[in-house]
């Protein structure tokens, strides 16, 4: 689960980390009032969405009057912000963060992820702040500094000081960086985070370090341990199809192709997408119906897939283990009839009673193509999507 910048900064402040004074508002009038509360003559206003690249898209602005702050809020509240990290529809803006202006001398990067290979939290730091860290890692990997956190003893101040020296920090900045480093590590562990970024972590004009941004992603599997953070969830930022799928315990991720995929098992689903792509097709989604491919779940899966108007054909790839393939076939037929599927549906069944399942599909009289293998299924659905 992603957090907004203002929510991330709330957590930063709870751990004593240096953040700008600011208020998240949802009306132009509140934006103007926030300027008065903060004080000063310059403020930064930021549209709050779960995506990067806001500045280049006009979603971040320096204003010098509370009227300009109100005008910015009027411009963006209720609108959708399109960035390089969103799709063409963008993300809805329901909050504006108004905060004090920070005068920057230098930008740094500091972030942390769970490294699956070492099974440790790994911190990354760089002198190249304010830009895409993936680009830095690709173009100049030597500029990425790393520190691995031992889960037994946690982050140690000496690790923070070591990173600080490598970043070229000096004097009080070294102590400040070590405090930020250990604070972020504690926050990461306390709240079951999957990713944390401060980009940029800045050196202000007076030489102090300051967390100018906050990007946080919480491990969805750990949400039951984080009741406080559940209230931070903003459903407006979710893809409506993905949110609908979650209600039925379906794992759905929207993509940009025209071939709908319905599979039981995440590994098989990824393999199915790969082979569709190998044969010249473009998957429209990832959809794992899980182990219980019942008629009800298959019906909902069809509804979700067909809500994407780009879908020209559907590939159903089911491996029958405990669940018999003939029962799955009957569920598919019932779902196709109930939903009123008008586009070609290619079905590949393998496993328990697969031959009987294929026979049931063939005798249904519906526009369902029974494939003999996964390769055949991919070839058939690509042809069907192309209208051949």
From Swiss-Prot:
Q: Which reaction does it catalyse?
A: succinate + ATP + CoA = succinyl-CoA + ADP + phosphate; GTP + succinate + CoA = succinyl-CoA + GDP + phosphate
| Cofactor binding remark | Binds 1 Mg(2+) ion per subunit.
Its pathway?
Answer: Carbohydrate metabolism; tricarboxylic acid cycle; succinate from succinyl-CoA (ligase route): step 1/1
Q: Which biological processes are named by the entry's GO terms?
A: succinyl-CoA metabolic process; tricarboxylic acid cycle
Which annotated residues bind Mg(2+)? 199, 213
Taking every annotated instance into account, which residue ranges of this chain make up the domain ATP-grasp? 9-244
Its required cofactor(s), as named, are: Mg(2+)
Any single Pfam family the record assigns to this protein: Ligase_CoA
Task: Supply the enzyme class, top level.
Answer: ligase
The record's annotation in InterPro entries points to: ATP-grasp, ATP-grasp_succ-CoA_synth-type, ATP_grasp_subdomain_1, Succ-CoA_synthase_bsu_CS, SUCC_ACL_C, Succ_CoA_ligase-like_bsu, Succinyl-CoA_synth-like
A GO CC annotation recorded here is:
succinate-CoA ligase complex
Residues of the signal peptide: none
Q: Which PROSITE patterns match?
A: ATP_GRASP, SUCCINYL_COA_LIG_3
Question: Which PANTHER family does this chain map to?
Answer: SUCCINATE--COA LIGASE [GDP-FORMING] SUBUNIT BETA, MITOCHONDRIAL, SUCCINYL-COA SYNTHETASE BETA CHAIN
Entry function: Succinyl-CoA synthetase functions in the citric acid cycle (TCA), coupling the hydrolysis of succinyl-CoA to the synthesis of either ATP or GTP and thus represents the only step of substrate-level phosphorylation in the TCA. The beta subunit provides nucleotide specificity of the enzyme and binds the substrate succinate, while the binding sites for coenzyme A and phosphate are found in the alpha subunit.
By sequence similarity, the record places it as follows:
Belongs to the succinate/malate CoA ligase beta subunit family.
How does it associate, per the subunit comment? Heterotetramer of two alpha and two beta subunits.
- What is the recorded name of this protein? Succinate--CoA ligase [ADP-forming] subunit beta
Q: Which organism is it from?
A: Pseudomonas savastanoi pv. phaseolicola (strain 1448A / Race 6)
Q: Which gene encodes it?
A: sucC
């Amino acid at each position: 689960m992603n957090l907004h910048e203002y929510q991330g900064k709330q957590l930063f402040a709870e751990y004593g980390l240096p953040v700008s004074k600011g208020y998240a508002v949802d009306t132009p009038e509140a934006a103007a009032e926030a300027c008065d509360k903060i004080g000063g003559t310059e403020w930064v206003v930021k549209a709050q969405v779960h995506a990067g690249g806001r500045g280049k898209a006009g979603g971040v602005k320096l204003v010098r009057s509370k009227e300009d702050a109100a005008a910015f809020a009027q411009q963006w509240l209720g609108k959708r912000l399109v960035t390089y990290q969103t799709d063409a529809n963008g993300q809805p803006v329901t909050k504006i963060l108004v905060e004090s202006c920070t005068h920057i001398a230098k930008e740094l990067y500091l972030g942390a992820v769970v490294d699956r290979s070492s099974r440790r939290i790994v911190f990354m730091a760089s002198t190249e702040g304010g830009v895409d860290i993936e680009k830095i890692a690709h173009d100049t990997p030597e500029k990425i500094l790393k520190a691995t956190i031992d889960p037994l003893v946690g982050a140690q101040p000496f690790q923070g000081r070591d990173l600080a020296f490598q970043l070229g920090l000096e004097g009080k900045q070294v102590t400040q960086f070590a405090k930020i480093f250990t604070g972020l590590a504690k926050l990461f562990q306390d709240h079951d985070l999957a990713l944390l970024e401060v980009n940029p972590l800045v050196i202000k004009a007076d030489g102090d370090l300051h967390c100018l941004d906050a990007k946080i992603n919480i491990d969805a599997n750990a949400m039951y341990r984080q009741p406080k953070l559940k209230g931070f969830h903003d459903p407006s930022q979710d893809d409506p199809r993905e949110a609908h799928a979650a209600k039925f315990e379906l794992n759905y991720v929207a993509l940009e192709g025209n071939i709908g995929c319905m599979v039981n098992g995440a590994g098989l689903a990824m393999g199915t997408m790969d082979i569709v792509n190998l044969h010249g097709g473009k998957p429209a989604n990832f959809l794992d119906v899980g182990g219980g491919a019942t008629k009800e779940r298959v019906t909902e899966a069809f509804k979700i897939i067909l809500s994407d108007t780009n879908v020209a054909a559907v590939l159903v790839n089911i491996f029958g283990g405990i669940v018999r393939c003939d029962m799955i076939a009957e569920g598919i037929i019932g779902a196709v009839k109930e939903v009123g599927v008008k586009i070609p549906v290619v079905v590949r069944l393998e496993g328990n009673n697969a031959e009987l399942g294929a026979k049931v599909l063939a005798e249904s009289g519906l526009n369902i193509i029974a494939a003999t293998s996964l390769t055949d299924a991919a070839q058939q659905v690509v042809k069907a999507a192309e209208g051949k």
